[in-house]
Amino acid sequence: MNTKILALGLLSLALGASGCRNTGKQATQLQSVGIAVPRAARITIDKLPEILRNVQAGRTQFDFTGICGNGTDCIYFMQENGKFYIDFEAMSKEQLPYLDSLKQFAKEHNYPVVETTYNNTPVDYEHLKYAPVISLKVHADIDSIVKVGKQIEQTIFRNNERTVYEIVP
């Protein structure tokens, strides 16, 4: 569990500081001076079940994964006892309004919500010591959690079937 928190913390810090803006500009700049930069895998939402099957089978470095299309819409697919739930961490101030949107979404769909933190320091606001996390305790199989993730990305973040997401971590 501590490894999961540390990994999510480092990931959130990296995404919050640099943004998961899907432009590739930073990587291109570093590559132009001879620094090799690994690129995150990119998918559309229809490929998410395959990624989650790999997570569930233990074929990934961590027992969770996330998708991030524009730096604000990052959701994490967490695993517990073979079932998945979704976390959202508000690392930047532009993510804060989505906490209430996700709570409302969870209420409308009768998903239990847990408010927590990974003890990560927000990147551009100081009124909270740690970045808040909303955990939607869906406890679903892969097909069901993909539907929930797709609903969140489309209704809350206004993404669509063609949105390209980076897989994180």
Language model features: what each stretch is:
Residues M1-A7:
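Bacterial N-terminal signal peptides that target proteins for export
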Residues S18-C20:
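N-terminal Sec signal peptide cleavage junction
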Residues G9-G16:
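Bacterial N-terminal signal peptides
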Residues G24-P169:
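Structured alpha/beta or helical-core interaction and ligand-binding surfaces enriched in interleaved
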